[in-house]
Curated annotation (Swiss-Prot):
Biological role: Cell wall formation. Catalyzes the addition of glutamate to the nucleotide precursor UDP-N-acetylmuramoyl-L-alanine (UMA).
UniProt-recorded name of the protein: UDP-N-acetylmuramoylalanine--D-glutamate ligase
Entry's family note: Belongs to the MurCDEF family.
One MF term in the entry's GO annotations: UDP-N-acetylmuramoylalanine-D-glutamate ligase activity
Encoding gene (name): murD
Species per Swiss-Prot/TrEMBL record: Streptococcus pneumoniae (strain 70585)
Amino acid sequence: MKVIDQFKNKKVLVLGLAKSGESAARLLDKLGAIVTVNDGKPFEDNPAAQSLLEEGIKVITGGHPLELLDEEFALMVKNPGIPYNNPMIEKALAKGIPVLTEVELAYLISEAPIIGITGSNGKTTTTTMIGEVLTAAGQHGLLSGNIGYPASQVAQIASDKDTLVMELSSFQLMGVQEFHPEIAVITNLMPTHIDYHGSFSEYVAAKWNIQNKMTAADFLVLNFNQDLAKDLTSKTEATVVPFSTLEKVDGAYLEDGQLYFRGEVVMAANEIGVPGSHNVENALATIAVAKLRGVDNQTIKETLSAFGGVKHRLQFVDDIKGVKFYNDSKSTNILATQKALSGFDNSKVVLIAGGLDRGNEFDELVPDITGLKKMVILGQSAERVKRAADKAGVAYVEATDIADATRKAYELATQGDVVLLSPANASWDMYANFEVRGDLFIDTVAELKE
């Protein structure tokens, strides 16, 4: 990693632990900063805080005392999940203290070039596809960021022979200043996380931060299926490389069942190793990045053909007596579930849906769920999802939790059917995150098979 001295002997407050906060605290300590960590979880239930204290880092747990900011901190590094209306963050900003996320730290120390991937849906799959293609081509794509490996941790071990392939959320991108990827991808932009950002325009602005420092020597890969992406083209200094499944573009595109890059066939769409029209878009974005990095068509084709998907994103779990189970717990919004359903014959799908109630109506989902065999509905949003099912003419049953939903879905399915967990909602009404929800689905499927 690059050894930088801009944090040496500076007082830095790390707000919120989890993986990214813990990684940031250790990195800042290594760089000579005077680090204080503040986390809401009580110390006795906080292994990360206990570990950091043993390493000599100051920790304050069990709450977020505003008087802590009476100290003269030069910087705050916040956990990306903490909203900007948090009183600690509001006070820090009012005092003129810069508030960053650990993605910025990763950029500052990274010896490796960075490819950043953001968007409303498809981030994880596209990030993984890009990482696997680059690694197959000898460019060693190191996955990091929102995909589960803290960027600041991976950046410490990356050399200039590697490529940091970062999945970036809007939460993370709100906290960057100098962050400068060589290639950035925006998979798509849909109204999500409005409860965090306040409006769709603020959400788009957060995503757009990915390209703030890019120049004409850098490449911004955009989804030209969306008029919004086309409109944004004039608002960047970067060289835009489009991808589309709807039209021929000066980039990656679908035509007559083939995936092209600038007029050259790379592979057939039906050779992609994972189903669904959304994965064609993900593959096109990957092809654009790979070709910009000089990867040959055969390597791209072989890697994407063998691609097995990502856990919790249309993940094939098992087959029990001819009933296939797919875990799409990462589908936390309507668009993601629409795209998941596009890969299946509705008449053979039992869909498990529902979760955190964010006030959404699900009318947009009605055309996509019409013709489903059955639905199993759960969670805070159940009444709203049931209204959509009624409009679509789909019969449903209710469930108390994911385990109950999985069992009921299996009872409703017959040989040749698919049980699809694709909730179209966040998990936080019942579960800590979509991973926990998906893992419970996987565990229940395993129990059903016994």
